[in-house]
């Protein structure tokens, strides 16, 4: 397993739509293993393939706490079949929008159809934080970031901060 570089906003690569996976083969399994390793190292609770420069419809999620046994979920070609009308708000962050957090409201539950790590079709009824995380990661597959749900002002402030952080990092590296 390899830890890969996570792309950060305002990288235009993050804004593209991801392509469906034709079949879950060894290449896709290696991708999922690398994504999981990258997510744990960051650390984070969810990651979409596009965030590491692979525009495929693959996401990984693990909501287990540090002291708990790992419980990774793998979603290939996820598709939301149903969302609740009731919303829930969580303070969201994102590995591609480092050190920035904001309250985002999303449907509290969702039903998702997907292929698992072994390519088997599954359906999951998710609620609460898991539902929010699935929807957040699936947004990445459409080129959408959580900051797109914020006011123009809040979004522009965050993007300016990220650009400044990036420039400062480049100065340090060079």
Residue ranges and their predicted role:
Residues 1-135, 140-174:
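Active-site rim/adjacent substrate-binding subdomains
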